[in-house]
Structure formats: structure tokens, C-alpha cells
Amino acid sequence: MATKKNQILVPDHIYVPKHEIISKTEAEEVLKKYNCKPTELPLIFVNDPAILGLGVKPGDMIKITRKSPTAGEGLYYRYVVEV
């Protein structure tokens, strides 16, 4: 079991893709581009270990940048919800 002294920070792990909060303007552009509502995006809980240090709140949108051997980089968007 991890103690506070040797606790693992999930966002710093090599297999966890980069997560970042996007601005309301950028979120609106994404929703317009994909012609969808925020609740139609994949959901992520506000207490998800990958986003704990970002200071997210329900209603925020997260951009996940994944590395891909074929595409190089892939973008993925998730909508933050309360548990």
C-alpha cells in the first residue's frame, strides 16, 4: 500500500496521457466541430486520479493528448462530471 511518503503521482506515469483543462472558448469550438453537446462526450469523474491535480470542476472539458505509433498524436475530449 502506498503511503504519503511513497505515493505515486498518476499524471506523471509514463503510460498516462497528458490531460489538460481547455478554455470555454476552445470547448465551444470542439462542440461545434463535432456537432455535439457536452454530455454526449465521454465522461470523466471529477475525482479521477489522472486529473486530480488539475483543479477541475464539474462542467469543465478535458483534452487528452495520446501518443500513437501510427497517427503520431491523437486528441480525445472528455466532459467532467460529479461522482
UniProtKB/Swiss-Prot annotation:
EC number per UniProt: 2.7.7.6
UniProt entry tagged with the keyword Nucleotide-binding: no
GO CC annotations on file: cytoplasm; DNA-directed RNA polymerase complex
UniProt entry tagged with the keyword Cytoplasm: yes
Keywords attached to this entry: Cytoplasm, DNA-directed RNA polymerase, Nucleotidyltransferase, Transcription, Transferase
GO molecular function, one term: DNA binding
Compartments, record wording: Cytoplasm
Gene Ontology BP annotations: DNA-templated transcription
Catalytic activity: RNA(n) + a ribonucleoside 5'-triphosphate = RNA(n+1) + diphosphate
Enzyme category, top tier: transferase
Function: DNA-dependent RNA polymerase (RNAP) catalyzes the transcription of DNA into RNA using the four ribonucleoside triphosphates as substrates.
Assembly: Part of the RNA polymerase complex.
Family, as annotated: Belongs to the archaeal Rpo5/eukaryotic RPB5 RNA polymerase subunit family.
Protein name: DNA-directed RNA polymerase subunit Rpo5
Upper classification of the organism: Archaea, Nitrososphaerota, Nitrososphaeria, Nitrosopumilales, Nitrosopumilaceae
